[in-house]
Amino acid sequence: MRKRIGVYKSALRLLGDMAPVVQTIAVVAPDRHHPKIQENAIQDCWQVLLEWLERFSFKREPQTEVILVPDEGNPLTVRKLARRRRRFAYAPSAFPGGSSQKVPFPRLVEDPLHRNSRDSYFLQWADFVANAAFRTVIPRADLPPNLWGELGDAALAAANGQRPRNEPPGVIVWPDRRM
């Protein structure tokens, strides 16, 4: 087990060495039955991630395009959410009684390109990152407590924005724990 953890940490550190070319964010839902989760945890996490990617691609200088390459877990759900977000996304008003704004995601280039993670080192790395984020939010006794920290500068702290300060940089805990 120790050797595997060492290899795992080395893979995460290698991503950290590639920063700022490689940047990582993660959305973790520690409680699937939280009252703030509107549909199901997987859909809500994808929705939060797509919202964040839309803002990131729009505000970045120069503006950048986004291509989603998820694993084969939920292809229909992810495709449906991405298509809806690309054309019809809305942002609610920040003020009571205000009107919502249309905020489409035109920088999402194509439908998600689903791949089997067994066939892609890129997606295996994404699985490592997702597991590191999950285990940082929900630790396990037999694993090191802060695997996410191994990513170093690759963990995109800007993802947290105005979110609670107790979240690790680049990890969005959804729904947040302020409720």
Where are these regions (language model features)?
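Phosphate-ester processing/binding pockets and catalytic centers
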Residues: M1-M179
